[in-house]
Amino acid sequence: MFVPYVIERTSRGERSYDIYSRLLKDRIVMLSGEINDEVASSVVAQLLFLEAEDPDKDIYLYINSPGGVVTSGFSIYDTMNYIKPAVSTICIGQAASMGAFLLSCGEKGKRYALPNARIMIHQPLGGAQGQATDIEITTKEILRIKATLNKILAENSGQKLSKIEKDTDRDFYMSAQEAVKYGLIDKVLEKSLTE
């Protein structure tokens, strides 16, 4: 992936940054692509760094993700709750599966999507092979994770758990406007939050 650089001029001269480091100075964290352990570790490290820099200032988590590994997503979710700063979530492009879950986990009142963003929720994906007892153990764990995800989505959206269970049984797509009505986000943004 090509990462652009920006040049900043200061009284002490010029300094070049990769674009993500420059955005981090403005407390912006980008979550792009599949959520795996490597991506989650990077996001968690940035959240912890920004908390250390200023624990009273909001952090902006921009999400454009098709989802990914549940445990990786949970590490981001737990860190969002662990740190003191409010984490505002903004969907750009898409937030599907674990991406949609994390979008809904932003600070209430500060969960956004751009007008043409797409949000999709569904049940966790998994598989098992091997001995019957191993398959049974894996099945129980997937069902436990599914129940946890549904409970948190219900809390975040204000929907009844039974509705979340029904809607996540299959892929459930929403426009940004529909996600507001559903309760996953609070507002569709037409203009930047910094204006």
Curated annotation (Swiss-Prot):
Catalysed reactions listed for this entry: Hydrolysis of proteins to small peptides in the presence of ATP and magnesium. alpha-casein is the usual test substrate. In the absence of ATP, only oligopeptides shorter than five residues are hydrolyzed (such as succinyl-Leu-Tyr-|-NHMec, and Leu-Tyr-Leu-|-Tyr-Trp, in which cleavage of the -Tyr-|-Leu- and -Tyr-|-Trp bonds also occurs)
PROSITE patterns referenced in this protein's UniProt entry, alphabetically: CLP_PROTEASE_HIS (PS00382), CLP_PROTEASE_SER (PS00381)
One function term, GO molecular function aspect: serine-type endopeptidase activity
InterPro entries reported for this sequence: ClpP, ClpP/crotonase-like_dom_sf, ClpP/TepA, ClpP_His_AS, ClpP_Ser_AS
Gene Ontology biological process terms from the UniProt entry: protein quality control for misfolded or incompletely synthesized proteins
Active site as annotated: S97, H122
Coiled coil regions in record: none
Known EC number: 3.4.21.92
Entry's Gene Ontology cellular component terms: cytoplasm; endopeptidase Clp complex
Keywords: Cytoplasm, Hydrolase, Protease, Serine protease
Enzyme superclass (EC): hydrolase
SUPFAM superfamilies membership: ClpP/crotonase
Transmembrane helix in keyword set: no
Pfam families xrefs: CLP_protease
Subcellular location field: Cytoplasm
Domain of life: Bacteria
Entry similarity comment: Belongs to the peptidase S14 family.
PANTHER family in alphabetical order: ATP-DEPENDENT CLP PROTEASE PROTEOLYTIC SUBUNIT (PTHR10381:SF70)
Known partners and oligomeric status: Fourteen ClpP subunits assemble into 2 heptameric rings which stack back to back to give a disk-like structure with a central cavity, resembling the structure of eukaryotic proteasomes.
Biological role: Cleaves peptides in various proteins in a process that requires ATP hydrolysis. Has a chymotrypsin-like activity. Plays a major role in the degradation of misfolded proteins.
Protein name: ATP-dependent Clp protease proteolytic subunit
Lineage, highest ranks first: Bacteria, Pseudomonadati, Campylobacterota, Epsilonproteobacteria, Campylobacterales
